[in-house]
């Protein structure tokens, strides 16, 4: 199992579903995904630190432009870092996501 798969499993299907998570990206040392429904955060990045804790970074997409180049659609995005939190234990993931996004992660 990869680190990204482990993080996704720790978050759980319900959490990812409630966040409207999509475009999950395996970063080798972590997981990055987009969410829907939050006015403060659009992207969450969770990286495994060598201390066996996580570094969570929350991003807001400020600008998104799409254009066709040689009939291929390209998207350009400008991201703004909202918050970075170090030394996060796996059992704090839900609480911190709820705090930063304003969205529920559990029923």
Each predicted region: which residue ranges?
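Short, surface-exposed beta-strand/strand-loop-strand elements in extracellular ectodomains
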Residues: 52-65
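Short beta-strand micro-motifs enriched in acidic
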Residues: 47-51
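Mixed-charge, Lys/Arg-enriched low-complexity segments
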Residues: 62-107
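Ser/Thr- (and often Asn-) enriched beta-sheet segments in non-cytosolic proteins
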Residues: 32, 55-57, 78, 84
């Amino acid at each position: 199992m990869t680190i990204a798969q482990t993080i996704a499993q720790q978050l759980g299907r319900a959490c990812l579903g409630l966040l409207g998570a999509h475009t999950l990206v395996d970063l080798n040392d972590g997981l990055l995904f987009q969410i829907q429904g939050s006015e403060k955060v659009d992207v969450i990045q969770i990286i495994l630190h060598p201390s066996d804790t996580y570094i969570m970074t929350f991003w807001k997409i400020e600008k998104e432009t799409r254009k066709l180049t040689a009939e291929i659609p390209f998207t350009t995005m400008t991201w703004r870092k909202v918050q970075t939190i170090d030394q996060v234990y796996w059992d704090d993931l839900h609480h911190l996501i709820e705090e930063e996004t304003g969205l529920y992660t559990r029923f």
